[in-house]
Amino acid sequence: MAEQESLEFGKADFVLMDTVSMPEFMANLRLRFEKGRIYTFIGEVVVSVNPYKLLNIYGRDTIEQYKGRELYERPPHLFAIADAAYKAMKRRSKDTCIVISGESGAGKTEASKYIMQYIAAITNPSQRAEVERVKNMLLKSNCVLEAFGNAKTNRNDNSSRFGKYMDINFDFKGDPIGGHINNYLLEKSRVIVQQPGERSFHSFYQLLQGGSEQMLRSLHLQKSLSSYNYIHVGAQLKSSINDAAEFRVVADAMKVIGFKPEEIQTVYKILAAILHLGNLKFVVDGDTPLIENGKVVSIIAELLSTKTDMVEKALLYRTVATGRDIIDKQHTEQEASYGRDAFAKAIYERLFCWIVTRINDIIEVKNYDTTIHGKNTVIGVLDIYGFEIFDNNSFEQFCINYCNEKLQQLFIQLVLKQEQEEYQREGIPWKHIDYFNNQIIVDLVEQQHKGIIAILDDACMNVGKVTDEMFLEALNSKLGKHAHFSSRKLCASDKILEFDRDFRIRHYAGDVVYSVIGFIDKNKDTLFQDFKRLMYNSSNPVLKNMWPEGKLSITEVTKRPLTAATLFKNSMIALVDNLASKEPYYVRCIKPNDKKSPQIFDDERCRHQVEYLGLLENVRVRRAGFAFRQTYEKFLHRYKMISEFTWPNHDLPSDKEAVKKLIERCGFQDDVAYGKTKIFIRTPRTLFTLEELRAQMLIRIVLFLQKVWRGTLARMRYKRTKAALTIIRYYRRYKVKSYIHEVARRFHGVKTMRDYGKHVKWPSPPKVLRRFEEALQTIFNRWRASQLIKSIPASDLPQVRAKVAAVEMLKGQRADLGLQRAWEGNYLASKPDTPQTSGTFVPVANELKRKDKYMNVLFSCHVRKVNRFSKVEDRAIFVTDRHLYKMDPTKQYKVMKTIPLYNLTGLSVSNGKDQLVVFHTKDNKDLIVCLFSKQPTHESRIGELVGVLVNHFKSEKRHLQVNVTNPVQCSLHGKKCTVSVETRLNQPQPDFTKNRSGFILSVPGN
């Protein structure tokens, strides 16, 4: 369990108070405010007191403390209510909403921003790029809407002057995928006039203070706020908002959201055009109205991308259609000023609505298919203007306070009235708790035919000139007996009210005196059609799209539009219906004082808000009531896995009996009540424990399902693999048979062919038979060789084998192997080769045979050798099957050196036509010689020497390494050296010479 607050901070939940009374409630609220604890629970309702200072309780660490936690686990916080709404939406796939209410300056807008920040922070753990993009745009939209819809008032430096309801759409995983914003009743009159101590919308000041010099020049603006009539009232006011810095923030946010550069530029042009409109002055020359500063008209025309004469005409004249006739009616100075102001208000309102629509176009959910992506759920966040009581309350305050009456009625219906009625319907023992039901005030305003809005609409539709005083008279006549309505005519002794001007409504939040001045005009919301046509004909496509009705013909008769009050009433009814369809969570904001001080807690001011918000009644209902209720069927569907009596299905008489069994199994029977169709759970702790038990069981269920599914998958994979292996086996057998049949077909009758099938092409074998094919080809080649050998005399076979060995070792590396001649081998005994000494050699050879017991002579030949001392001499070599003898032919073939063949490790020859050969020995005493023949001269015998030696070594199952290089590497008594071969003209015979790296064998050139 997470750490809870100590008692020094008071009660974290008003439900835990010892006695439910206003003094104790206020004492606890004050204590927590003074201790810096601005949030307190009433069950699942959060009471928030505006601290009027920045608190370090909204960072990432705090977010992590509340993420996934239940309400009772952490101290009260906005994050707790946001997480509760998110979990309810995700767990039960149910739409939820967070309703933030309270009077102006109580901190509603900041609360909505922190809630949005929290939801953005806890979603999209997998960091999907598209979800991050949506989250970023949802957050950035806040500062854009604040810039164009918020203003400094006497009660709040960042007061929302419009209502905002945002739906955030989530996919089945709980990640935001889009959203939609509804805006309500922008206070557009603030564009042209503000009360003392207040400012117009932030956007004007941000543009003038944050725009670059170049930008302001292009818009024909200057930084001086007092230069513009529409905003000069608040020019000298100090604000906690840094307009220049906010301008850059808003500009960046618009880019991030997806506004195009030309769209952003159009926004600045519209703001500049409004400021210039306010500086227009009208004079009358006789009966003709004129614009005193005509240059400003040209600037406005340039900014609005239209023609100067068209702007001037729309400001000074009104086009009237009477039947088929069209006339231009001149304005009086007063009418021209009225038209100018109406135009400025309308432009700004259209701009604001266009910004909202543009944001919606970008953030709305696109291409979402519930069959593929699962159910799309919603969390709604309502941030709407709070209850307002000013020194001068007009039509805007009337609408705003009506909105708050509707929201209070929703709270009463859902939290107080419906809850008590449900207990009675379900047969739950209950003691009724009294509360003030403000439905009577809601009806006073919105009732059909009898309410104030209906009376106002009737007055606006009357033929002839209707004044605000006539409207007040109609109110007195029709509502004179209403308990919550009064005026000076109805109560002559009440001197607070002015005759023919004021009326009072007793709102749930207190009495408010309204001045009827401007009610008729603001309700009609009149804007001459000339201005609409002017804007529709703009060459700027953004402006053109803002005024679609401007395309109507002058003579076209249109239906009377709904009045501003009726439009607002309809939007409020739709909003309340929307909120009622969702599971609501409430944040009740309280303003501690009127001085915006973080140190002052005004008891009377706060008590009044606690009373009209019905917070004490909320505590009583909460203490006596139940935190959660659910139908037996749905409850069982969610929690049946907790008990063995209900999992997977129960066999009890009814769902109610099954739920009872489940609750008793968990030991919660003292904390629940059983209604006719629903179970009621008193404390959140029980519900949270049920959720924990369910989460634990879900892990086991998921593991079981995973085990079963893995087994199923394994069996399926085994069957598929077994089938595949069977197919592979039969296919391989088929390929093998096909290959063997094809080989048999192609090589059929090769024995009768002249070349024994040498030209027959082998078929391509399957992969599995590649090694078999190699073996088969080897067998075939041996058979073919045996067939060829049969025709060779037995005496020639050793020579053939030697030639084959030579080819294997030297083919492709030496040009001439001597294959075309007969290989005699023992050339020293041959008279043609050594006619004078052959007779001398034979006795020596016989003596060596007797002495060394050799069986066969492999090779003998005259050579020229070089030793380590660079001495070059003519010698002879005599190779038997046991030894290599170096002999001196000048001394009757005396044996100079004997090398056993087992001591021979390899041969090295060059890659040319020379006869160089190096015999490598184990003791690194290599023998370097160059073969030569006397008859015929320059006969190549290297191939023969290599062939007979390799063939002999092979017969003894030994390997003789043969190297073909140039230069040739050798070792003379352990000293490494090289022998390179050079061809020289006029060289009579091969000869060795010394060089730096070893020796050079010079051979005769052609």
Swiss-Prot record:
The modification N-acetylalanine is found at A2. Expressed in many tissues. Highest levels in brain, followed by lung and ovary; expression is lowest in spleen. The modification Phosphotyrosine is found at Y536. Residues 572-594 are annotated as: Actin-binding. The modification Phosphoserine is found at S200. ATP binds at G102, E103, S104, G105, A106, G107, K108, T109. It is found in: Cytoplasm; Perikaryon; Cell projection, Dendrite; Early endosome. Gene3D superfamilies: 1.10.10.820, 1.20.5.4820, 1.20.58.530, Kinesin motor domain, Myosin VI head, motor domain, U50 subdomain. Keywords: Acetylation, Actin-binding, ATP-binding, Calmodulin-binding, Cell projection, Cytoplasm, Endosome, Motor protein, Myosin, Nucleotide-binding, Phosphoprotein, Protein transport, Repeat, Transport. The keyword ATP-binding applies. Unconventional myosin that functions as actin-based motor protein with ATPase activity. Plays a role in endosomal protein trafficking, and especially in the transfer of cargo proteins from early to recycling endosomes. Required for normal planar cell polarity in ciliated tracheal cells, for normal rotational polarity of cilia, and for coordinated, unidirectional ciliary movement in the trachea. Required for normal, polarized cilia organization in brain ependymal epithelial cells. Interacts (via the two IQ motifs) with calmodulin. Binds an additional calmodulin chain via a third, C-terminal region. Interacts with F-actin. This is Unconventional myosin-Id. It comes from Homo sapiens.
